[in-house]
């Protein structure tokens, strides 16, 4: 009887070893990711913020996830989503045509500058803002919605009390260290992007439209997308500003895996520092390796 009991205990202990090893491996992996991100940040000479949400199990990988960063053009997603939200009760909203005057044009307006005679619909402006990062398109959306505070109010309506839009383009890209205007945190943005593209913050049709716009982005090839396997589907929105601020937020559909939501924000000490898209690509590779 004693021998049988000892054998049972030994078998149970042996069975537990792989679980303990697996658990230790998971923790080691998480620690390794943090160290790799810290090393990347140190090599890059700036401040890096990362938030990854794995929707397969709701796990999160965060690096400075609760620190504020200037959003720059990644905030255009929230403005476009606010327009889409209005179209749930009034489908014709997206077809509303807005006049575009020469005096409306600001720096980097590759699409709107071609429509001074015809104007553009809110749907066209949303696409221009998201897929080409057209700044005048963003300003026209903000104006239609009633000002930056209305975009912030929409963010709050979906549970995001961190996001704040205070100015229009291009002033919102000043990215002054310590300035809370036009900022959010990587985690807050990741949670909002998940709600907007994978959750129920928008109606089914509006959500599908937002995803389509993001997948058609033309500005993200060297950022998050560059750090992922080419076979993975990605919808993203980039951003850039002073102090070498370089941003990208993305929804990712890996092969044979639940979607991922990834936010990468990077900023530097010098006001005239150059954009560093390769840092975002490297961060994306670090946090998605092994999936």
UniProtKB/Swiss-Prot annotation:
Pfam families xref list: Beta-lactamase2
Catalytic reaction list: a beta-lactam + H2O = a substituted beta-amino acid
- Signal sequence residues: 1-24
Which Cys residues form disulphide pairs? none
- The active site is formed by 73 (acyl-ester intermediate)
Q: Tell me which UniProt keywords the record has, alphabetically.
A: Antibiotic resistance, Hydrolase, Signal
Q: Which NCBIfam families match?
A: bla_class_A, blaOXY
The entry assigns this protein to a family as follows: Belongs to the class-A beta-lactamase family.
Protein's name according to its UniProt entry: Beta-lactamase OXY-1
Query: What species is this protein from?
Result: Klebsiella oxytoca
Which gene underlies this protein? bla
